[in-house]
Amino acid sequence: YIPVVSTVGCDAEGGVYNINADDAAAMIAASLGAAALISMTDVSGIMKDKNDPSTLIPVIKTSEAPYLVESGVIAGGMIPKTRCCINAVNSGVERVFIIDGRIPHAILIEMLTSEGIGTMFVKG
């Protein structure tokens, strides 16, 4: 199954709230016992130098991610996305991917090739 979920919520008084889509996806994937979660964005994945696509980090272990944040490799909007990836893996999702959704067939390339095209988070 591929759940499609709106991340807009409301409270008892009818107030409307924007719920972080990455947080929602991580929680849903963990609750479903998903083997994988794919986050499609407008960047190739986590890069050592955000301006140099050749520095893409193909695999990040959950234990390595805090160092990458502290050292500034992971910065800005990628910090909460990384946090969600780590939370999903630590909650039982085997693999979490960040891939560039602008690339045609990005999901197929990531899932069906040995090298992939994005960054994969795994436990470790």
State the predicted function of each range:
Residues 1-124:
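C-terminal catalytic "cap/lid" subdomain
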